[in-house]
Amino acid sequence: MSEQGVSFGKALQLTNVLRDVPGDLAHGRCYLPARELAALGLGPRDLLEPAGAARARPLYRRLLGLALEHYDVAWDYTLAIPRREWRMRLACAWPLLIGLATLAALTAHPNPLGVTAPVKIPAAPCALLARSAFTVWSNRALAAHAARVRATIAV
């Protein structure tokens, strides 16, 4: 369960890193792997240019895929929490649903490295959160919620 908890944290952290790349670059920060950027012949400043952002797209997609792998493990962690601990299950499920919706918005964006404002999730996933409060006791229903959101992510 401890290793699953680590993946839970990595899923959310990697989502934040991927969502915040443009803003971080504007403030002189870059949390993408420097070694992998260098292998592509890129530095952080190159990502500010459309050509550099386009060349970094495979790395960005790979990191999105890695985040999804961590989300899969994080859901196993969440579903392992006893059903009677519904508050704890919701405390885990909601960030995961929001994170998956954020990844879906990032993959749907034509140039997530070039956005000027942070990507926000639309209202529909928020309704999914509300519904999850009624199905928190069911592993099948929570897993179905996650699967519906995950199915919208094209990596």
Model-derived features: positions:
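Catalytic cores of Mg2+-dependent Asp-rich isoprenoid enzymes
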Residues: 1-12, 18, 22-155
